[in-house]
Regions:
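Hydrophobic h-region of N-terminal signal peptides that target proteins for export
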Residues: 16-23
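Compact beta-sheet-dominated domain cores in extracellular/mature segments
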Residues: 2-13, 25-189
Length: 189
C-alpha cells in the first residue's frame, strides 16, 4: 500500500451506493473471468489479492461484506433503490469494507469486480490505497462505482503510472474516452 499526494478537495464525502447490473441466477463460485456471453461478478480482497467470482450479485456482496450482508438484492440495479440494503452497507465496520465496484461495460453492464479493502478512505489529499489489476481485468473497465468514502483514480499503467483520470466521486455509468478499456491500476483516495 502506497500513499501518494493528489489534489483533492477534502469537503465532499461520497455516499455508499450501488449501481445497476444484471445478475445471472446461479451462486456457484468460479475462478477468473467468464466466457463471452455470460457476466460474472467477482470480489477481490486487496490485501491478499484473492479473487472469487460468482454468477449472482447477492453472492458477491455476501463474500465482500464478510457474510454481514447475506440477503442483498439479486441485482445491483435492484440494490440502488433498496433502503434496507443501503443501511446495511453503511453499518459495516470500518475494517474490511467494499471500496469500489468496476464494470466491464458502460451503464454498469457486463462482468463486475468489487474490491474490498481494509477501511474507508480519508479525505486528506492522499491516495490511501492502490491496486494493480490482475491481467484478466486490465483494459476492461468502462463504468465505476465508489464506496466507503473513496474517490477513484484510474491509471493506464501498473503502480499508478501514466496520466490518471478522476477522481470519480460518484457512480459513473461511463468513465469517458480517456480511460475506457485502458485501466491497469486504481488509486483509492
Amino acid at each position: 500500500m502506497t500513499r501518494r499526494a493528489v489534489s483533492v478537495p477534502a469537503t465532499v464525502i461520497t455516499a455508499l451506493v450501488l449501481a445497476a447490473t444484471v445478475a445471472i441466477p446461479s451462486a456457484e463460485a468460479t475462478h477468473g473471468v467468464a466466457a463471452t456471453g455470460s457476466a460474472e461478478h467477482c470480489v477481490l480482497d486487496m490485501a491478499s489479492g484473492e479473487q472469487s467470482c460468482y454468477r449472482t450479485f447477492t453472492a458477491v456482496i455476501d463474500l465482500a461484506s464478510g457474510g454481514e450482508i447475506a440477503d442483498a438484492p439479486a441485482s445491483a440495479r435492484a440494490a440502488v433503490g433498496d433502503s434496507t440494503f443501503r443501511a446495511d452497507l453503511q453499518s459495516l465496520e470500518a475494517n474490511d469494507v467494499i471500496q469500489g465496484t468496476f464494470f466491464e461495460d458502460e451503464q454498469y453492464g457486463g462482468s463486475s469486480l468489487t474490491i474490498r479493502g481494509s477501511g474507508p478512505c480519508e479525505k486528506d489529499g492522499w491516495v490511501d490505497y492502490q491496486y494493480d489489476l490482475p491481467d484478466e481485468w486490465k483494459n476492461r473497465i468502462s463504468s465505476v462505482q465508489p464506496w466507503a468514502e473513496c474517490w477513484l483514480w484510474l491509471y493506464p499503467e501498473p503502480g499508478l503510472g501514466g496520466d490518471r483520470d478522476g477522481p470519480f466521486k460518484e457512480n459513473s455509468p461511463a468513465i469517458g474516452s480517456v480511460m475506457n478499456d485502458r485501466t491497469q491500476s486504481i488509486g483509492f483516495s
